[in-house]
Curated annotation (Swiss-Prot):
The keyword 4Fe-4S applies. NCBIfam families: nuoB_fam (TIGR01957), PRK06411.1 (NF005012). The keyword 4Fe-4S applies. Its main location: membrane. It catalyses: a quinone + NADH + 5 H(+)(in) = a quinol + NAD(+) + 4 H(+)(out). It is a peripheral membrane protein. This is NADH-quinone oxidoreductase subunit B. It holds the Pfam family Oxidored_q6. Its EC number is 7.1.1.-. The gene is nuoB. [4Fe-4S] cluster binds at C46, C47, C112, C142. GO terms for cellular component: plasma membrane; respiratory chain complex I. One of its GO terms (biological process) is aerobic respiration. GO terms for molecular function: 4 iron, 4 sulfur cluster binding; iron ion binding; NADH dehydrogenase (ubiquinone) activity; NADH:ubiquinone reductase (non-electrogenic) activity; quinone binding.
Length: 173
């Protein structure tokens, strides 16, 4: 081992014995952001009912720190788009996204929000909200269960805590 590297490690160990933690500010901020999402709901169809069920006592989303659903996009950092998005609704979706402060993330909940679902061939439907806003996490299902929303939020938490890693965790690992 290099002498300079060994000296650096000894200094770090000495600081740790004095209860001094060395890390970058970005890691601390990302940890805080990942454990305290404030989602704004954009419920458009049946997926919104499952999103409301995720806030209920059976799923208990509050144990992860996500129970504070915001009515105003100016106080939120995660937008959950749940359900079908029509072409007439697209400008409103973009306006709400633009009102959110940085950093901000988007979750597309359900088949309709992700790829149009069974209405993909309709003239009035968008084939995915990623054509309007950048989507960070896709939750499949029609409609997805509340547990899937919790899993999607945990995937987003992992993505926020580890911005250098592109790959998300597999279920159960």
């Amino acid at each position: 081992m290099d002498v300079a590297k060994e000296k650096e490690l000894r200094e770090a160990e000495a600081l740790m014995e004095k209860n001094v933690l060395l890390t970058s500010i970005d890691k601390v901020l990302n940890w805080g952001r990942g454990h305290s999402f404030w989602p704004v709901t954009f419920g458009l169809a049946c997926c919104a009912i499952e999103m409301m069920a995720a806030g209920g006592p059976r799923v208990d989303i509050s144990r992860f720190g996500y129970e504070v659903f915001r009515a105003s996009p100016r106080h939120a950092d995660v937008m959950i788009v749940a359900g079908t998005c029509t072409r007439k609704m697209a400008p409103l979706l973009r306006m709400i996204y633009d009102q959110m402060p940085e950093p901000k993330w988007v979750i597309a909940m359900g088949s309709c929000a992700s790829a149009g679902g069974p209405f993909a061939d309709s003239y009035s439907m968008l084939t995915g909200v990623d054509k309007i806003v950048p989507v960070d996490v896709y939750i499949p299902g029609c409609p997805p269960r509340p547990e899937s929303l919790v899993y999607g939020l945990l995937q987003l938490q992992h993505k926020v805590n580890h911005p250098d890693k592109v790959r998300l965790l597999k279920h159960g690992k």
